[in-house]
Amino acid sequence: MTRSPSQRGFTLAETLVALFVLAIVSAAGTGLLMGASSSSKQLRDKETEIRTLDMAQAFLRNDIAALSMRATVPETGFGAPGNLFGNASDQRGPILAFVRSGWVNPQSREDRSTLQHVEYRLENNTLIRTATVRPDAVTGTPRVERILLEGVSRIDVRFLRGGEWSREWQGDAGQALHILPDLIELEIVFEDERELIISALTGGRI
């Protein structure tokens, strides 16, 4: 029995053409999915980067805004007291070190004041914030370290007081302890040559 033209199946050539078209469509679809997945990952990475930068800026701004005139003595117990120390990252010691106020202690539940000593330092291209539970820390005083930024090559810091800038601040170097800068500016340079500038007014000014 012969089949009518409407009942005739696909020829081999037609089948091969259909498979070829299907392969092209599938490849295009896979490419679109991979592209979308890559774009989604890039977006997530960018969002993570922005959150990290925002958090680092928030810590620095909040700490500087809460800067206290309270002087501290070196952890060793030797040396003059000081209320603010600052240097560029290529110098010895922390980039910033000072006492901040406003550390909330609801109903005085913990055996501590609202003051804490904070330090910012650059180690192995990583910006680290260290906070102690007491302003006058000694060996064994509990402290909390937090990594704020990675991939940092250099940090420069400037201090503005009465319209004049200086690149270091030594709170025990012949200055009255009640004198604080009006503004602190940090220029953070990353290994990929990006730059982040953070300027913050200080607390405890007179």
Regions inferred by a protein language model and the residue ranges of each:
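Short solvent-exposed loop/turn micro-motifs enriched in small/polar/acidic residues
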Residues: D111-S113, T139-G140, E150, I179-P181
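Extracytoplasmic beta-strand-rich oligomerization domains located immediately C-terminal to a leader/signal peptide
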Residues: A28-A137
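Short aromatic-glycine motifs in intrinsically disordered, low-complexity regions
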Residues: R134-I147
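Local beta-strand/beta-hairpin segments that build beta-sheet-rich folds
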Residues: L127, R146-S153
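Short linear sequence signals and composition-biased patches located at protein termini or domain-edge surfaces
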Residues: G151-I206
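N-terminal single-pass transmembrane signal-anchor helix
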Residues: M1-A36
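A broad, low-specificity signal marking well-ordered, structured residues that form hydrophobic/aromatic
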Residues: L96-A97, R146, I184
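Short, surface-exposed coil-to-beta transition loops
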Residues: S113-H117, P142-R143, I197
